From Swiss-Prot:
InterPro entries: ConA-like_dom_sf, Galectin-like, Galectin_CRD. It comes from Sus scrofa (Pig). It comes from the Eukaryota. Residues 19-150, 194-323 form the Galectin domain. This is Galectin-4. The keyword Glycosyltransferase does not apply. Keywords: Lectin, Repeat. Galectin that binds lactose and a related range of sugars. May be involved in the assembly of adherens junctions. Contains two homologous but distinct carbohydrate-binding domains. One of its GO terms (molecular function) is carbohydrate binding. Gene3D superfamilies: 2.60.120.200.
Length: 323
């Protein structure tokens, strides 16, 4: 069962290195690039480049380069006409060897904003116009789990992390009308427990995206799709870390239904990031994790359109929720 990303959400899972690929539709203000990976135990350095074109001698609008060299630091720069510009550096290392990390680079009107594991780290002023950037390049001593290009939604959502305005879809990022849709704007790093209203209800073809991190001491977390007025839960997703299973259920008319436990794999593990896409279909929910089909859950609540609330709680740190 193939994974099809929703509009404005362009993920690549387990990409190989060196990574040098076009940015879908080109780079533009309001986009964010999410990079999840693991720093190698013997890491010396890695880099992320926002590149104008492809091939030797291409200009680099933004060069992000963590260096473990005894004087741990992160270097920032640009390259034009084959020459590096004035180097900026920060003598602080947000990455540790071996643990998983999440790097977010937000493209704002005046600068790139770098966020590591949810914490703002650096701002690098634009030296080359953003709209000229066409490719993303990543290489070095790391293993990539996913690269996500996020953008193209119509309005920002307030949240703890400053959220860039998302421009309306242009000719480069229009999506076929049969793709699943996301109704709301993204929220970055919301606190847990998390609760939000699903404006318009849980209609068929709607997709919810949840990106998060399970702490090393994590034991359990819960995701509920709920009818606010009655308390009914159309879909209850309960990863139990100590048991290594993902339990699904419903709670209707004051009673829990039969648990479903079988799944093709378990993406939830202590100390790991996850990327969950939950699609509502006419007869079932289809749930994907890290680009792979995880499970289906047939509707038990006939009026699933009445689901108007999303709840997330437990041992999880959320980095991104798109409704």
């Amino acid at each position: 069962m193939a994974f099809v990303p929703a509009p404005g959400y362009q993920p690549t899972y387990n990409p190989t290195l060196p990574y040098y690929k076009p940015i879908p539709g080109g780079l533009r203000v309001g986009m964010s690039v999410y990079i999840q990976g693991v720093a190698n135990e013997h890491m010396k350095r890695f880099f992320v480049n926002f590149v104008v074109g492809q091939g030797p001698g291409a200009d680099v609008a933004f060069h992000f380069n963590p260096r473990f060299d005894g004087w741990d630091k992160v270097v920032f720069n640009s390259q034009q006409d084959g020459k590096w510009g004035n180097e900026e550096k920060k003598r602080s290392m947000p990455f540790r060897k071996a643990p998983a990390f999440e790097l977010v680079i937000m493209v704002l009107p005046e600068h790139y904003k770098v966020v590591v594991n949810g914490d703002p780290f650096y701002e690098f002023g634009h030296r080359i116009p953003v709209q000229l950037v066409t490719h993303l390049q990543v290489d070095g001593d790391l293993t990539l789990q996913s690269i996500n290009f996020i953008g193209g939604q119509p309005a920002p959502s307030p949240g703890p992390m400053p959220n860039p305005g998302y421009p309306g879809p242009g000719k480069h990022n229009q999506q076929p009308c049969n793709l699943p849709c996301m109704e709301g704007a993204p929220t970055f790093n919301p606190p847990v427990p998390y609760k939000t209203r699903l404006q318009g209800g849980l209609v068929a073809r709607r997709t919810i995206v949840i990106k998060g991190y399970v702490p090393p001491s994590g034991k359990s977390l819960v995701i509920n799709f709920k009818v606010g007025s009655s308390g009914d839960v159309a879909l209850h997703i309960n990863p139990r870390l100590t048991e290594g299973i993902v339990v699904r259920n419903s709670y209707l008319n004051g009673k829990w239904g039969a648990e479903e436990r079988k799944s093709s794999f378990n993406p939830f593990a202590p100390g790991q990031y996850f990327d969950l896409s939950i699609r509502c279909g006419l007869d079932r929910f289809k749930v994907y994790a890290n680009g792979q089909h995880l499970f289906d859950f047939s509707h038990r609540l006939s009026n699933f359109q009445g689901v108007d609330t999303l709840e997330i709680q437990g041992d999880v740190t959320l980095s991104y929720v798109q409704i």
